[in-house]
């Protein structure tokens, strides 16, 4: 699970959350809480700079094209920033960790995840949102989701 990426490992958190939402089963959250927490710390300690996750392995490698010839375009104006993707996913994981901390009885962690999430969200908007155009980054579909 400890990779230098955020997007794919986020599935680990998402599956636990989906099991809780669909079945009310909190056991996966409780069982894996320490591992979730360790992953958040790993990313923070190794890849967080000025509240932006500065590394992404995969990025937006298969963006929706206007035509099929463009599906694997190498044009940088068509690719979503890996930093944008990783930071957005990291923020989502911090939001989930607030919930997981509460559900697993780790109430002492809730404030940390909330404060971290608030900082990440502010940094994300500061770096990627263009108020004059009303879109994020280079205005790809993925960047604006």
Model-derived segments and spans:
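Active-site acid/base region of carbohydrate-active enzymes
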Residues: 1-3, 10, 22-88, 101-145
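Core register positions within helices of long alpha-helical scaffolds
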Residues: 15-18, 93-96, 100
């Amino acid at each position: 699970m400890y990779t230098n990426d955020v997007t794919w490992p986020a599935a680990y958190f998402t599956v636990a959350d989906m099991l809780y939402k669909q079945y009310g089963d909190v056991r996966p959250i409780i069982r894996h809480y320490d591992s979730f927490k360790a992953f958040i710390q790993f990313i923070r300690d190794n890849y967080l700079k000025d509240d932006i996750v500065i590394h992404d392995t995969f990025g937006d490698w298969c963006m929706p094209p206007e035509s099929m010839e463009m599906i694997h375009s190498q044009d940088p104006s068509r690719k979503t920033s890996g930093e944008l993707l990783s930071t957005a996913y990291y923020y989502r994981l911090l939001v989930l960790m607030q919930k997981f901390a509460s559900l697993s009885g780790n109430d002492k962690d809730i404030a940390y995840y909330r404060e971290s999430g608030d900082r990440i969200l502010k940094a994300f908007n500061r770096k990627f949102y263009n108020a004059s155009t009303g879109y994020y980054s280079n205005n790809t579909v993925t960047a604006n989701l």
